[in-house]
Swiss-Prot record:
Belongs to the glutathione peroxidase family. PROSITE patterns: GLUTATHIONE_PEROXID_1 (PS00460), GLUTATHIONE_PEROXID_2 (PS00763), GLUTATHIONE_PEROXID_3 (PS51355). The keyword Cytoplasm applies. Its EC number is 1.11.1.12. Signal peptide: none annotated. One of its GO terms (molecular function) is phospholipid-hydroperoxide glutathione peroxidase activity. It catalyses: a hydroperoxy polyunsaturated fatty acid + 2 glutathione = a hydroxy polyunsaturated fatty acid + glutathione disulfide + H2O. The active site is at C41. The gene is CSA. It is found in: Cytoplasm. GO terms for cellular component: cytoplasm. This is Probable phospholipid hydroperoxide glutathione peroxidase.
Length: 167
């Protein structure tokens, strides 16, 4: 059974910002928006602000936002996990979980990101193009949509609402 390939986001374990394992099966029954984040990107302010707005509005209806810091794009996430948490929580009042810094591309890409990319390739192939690429994952752990870094979080609200309304 252990060799069975992982077909659901819920099959993965990731590290939180303190280095503790988090089994993503704890999010079964939740709608997930998974985002690679950075503190020093031109997209940072708008994305963190809108992600926080979405989270505040829909967290009680079953939305979870999982943020994965990544330093692969323009070295725009140079801080350690503590600095990243401090930045997101103080500056943007982010209440959603921010996990351990990961690679999203290349040989050392986090297994979760390999799965996300193989489930929903981008317009120009599988690789993540920049900070704030977004993946929408349904309550069963299936990747249902991928959004470009420039897609504003509020512009996908209709997709979130639709998926929250399904069983």
């Amino acid at each position: 059974m252990a060799s069975q390939s992982k077909t659901s986001v819920h099959d993965f374990t990731v590290k939180d910002a303190k280095g503790q394992d988090v089994d993503l099966s704890i999010y079964k029954g939740k709608l997930l928006l998974i985002v690679n984040v950075a503190s020093q990107c031109g997209l940072t302010n708008s994305n963190y602000t809108e992600l926080s707005q979405l989270y505040d509005k829909y967290k009680n209806q079953g939305l979870e936002i999982l943020a994965f810091p990544c330093n692969q794009f323009g070295a725009q996430e140079p801080g350690d996990n503590e600095q990243i948490q401090e930045f997101a929580c103080t500056r943007f009042k982010a209440e959603f979980p921010i996990f351990d810094k990961v690679d999203v591309n290349g040989d050392n890409a986090a297994p979760l990101y390999k799965h996300l990319k193989s489930s929903k390739g981008g317009l120009f192939g599988d690789s993540i193009k920049w900070n704030f690429s977004k993946f929408l994952v349904d309550k069963e752990g299936n990747v249902v949509e991928r959004y470009a870094p420039t897609t504003s979080p509020l512009s996908i609200e209709k997709d979130i609402k639709k998926l929250l309304e399904t069983a």
